[in-house]
Design a protein with these regions (language model features):
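Metallocofactor- and cofactor-centric catalytic cores in central/energy metabolism, strongly enriched
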Residues: 1-166
Length: 166
């Protein structure tokens, strides 16, 4: 087995440059690699959580602030046992037509429940996590929201996290 270079271990070479090209003003200046972690046991025995930037939340909870010029630096816990009918989307920064027809397109809660029931993946954490992806202050996002979500993921006992941008 050959040793992987530092560059091949990152999320994707040139990721931050690509984001800055596509979203001028995003202010991302990261130069370090984003490491990928290997699972220590089979996925079928791993406790999984889901983290999404889709702006999904339990119906009736305080909506995300989708009009603030720098974004909303909060997140919602979404019980992993939720039914799609118990959830709603609060997002205006991307087209939601497909998501309104089938929320699983961007927040695959039913598919994850099925995969867990079929023992393809281990059990699900009590909560999944969602925030709005429109964040124009990446440093603040990393210092506050990302740290808070990471702490919540750990507190929920996750052994692996599936991250899904909207």
């Amino acid at each position: 087995m050959t040793e992987l270079s530092d560059e091949s271990k990152q999320l994707r070479p040139g990721l931050w440059e690509t984001i800055n090209e596509r979203y001028p003003g995003s202010m991302i200046t990261k130069k370090e690699f984003v490491p990928l972690a290997r699972l220590s046991k089979p996925l079928s025995q791993t406790r999984l959580t889901f983290v999404s930037s889709a702006g999904i939340q339990p119906r009736g909870t305080l909506p995300f602030d989708v009009v603030h010029p720098v974004g909303d630096f909060s997140f919602h816990r979404v019980p992993s046992t939720s039914k799609v009918s118990d959830l709603e989307i609060h997002q205006i920064k991307y087209p939601t037509t497909g998501a309104l027809k089938d929320l699983n397109v961007i927040f695959p809660i039913e598919r994850l429940q099925e995969l867990s029931a079929e023992h393809v993946i281990g059990e699900l954490t009590p909560n999944f996590f969602s925030f709005i992806g429109y964040q124009m202050d990446p440093s603040r996002f990393e210092r506050t929201l990302a740290e808070e979500i990471a702490n919540a993921v750990v507190a929920d006992g996750a052994e692996a996290a599936l991250l899904c941008p909207a």
